[in-house]
Amino acid sequence: MGVVTQIYDTPAAVPPTRLFKAMTLDFHNLFPKLVDSIHSIVFTQGNGGPGTIKKITTIEGDKTKYVLHRVDAIDEANFVYNFSITEGTALADTLEKVSFESQLVEAPNGGSIRKVSVQFFTKGDATLSEEELTANKAKIQGLVKLVEGYLLANPDY
């Protein structure tokens, strides 16, 4: 098994408290409304704390896929949320799992910076192409920007 790590920051024009609520605490309610391909997010174990498992079901075209999202750590006071994608039909065959460590910090402009470390645990000698890594980074940063846009348009959320 190999491990490939990506580290990057994504700025957002909303404070950490609002972004953390939307991207972490209310993720299961908000993302199916914002992301067309997400059909549902269901708790299969736990209540949101470490050890909780959420089943995320997506529909793309005529294909239904899912992943299991396991909460590894959550620290509301410091805006930390760590989770792993551990299995599912939407997890690439070459991957054992994908782990995310994220923290929101306050930006000088009153917004946020989402600091993320992503670890891809590959099966056997499998590798990830630069295109796959670039696409993954764009997808994750795009989700932050999608939520940012929603929060800016809905200041009472």
From Swiss-Prot:
Pfam families: Bet_v_1. The keyword Translocase does not apply. One of its GO terms (molecular function) is RNA nuclease activity. GO terms for biological process: abscisic acid-activated signaling pathway; defense response to fungus. Belongs to the BetVI family. PANTHER family: OS08G0374000 PROTEIN-RELATED, PATHOGENESIS-RELATED PROTEIN 10. This is Pathogenesis-related protein 10.
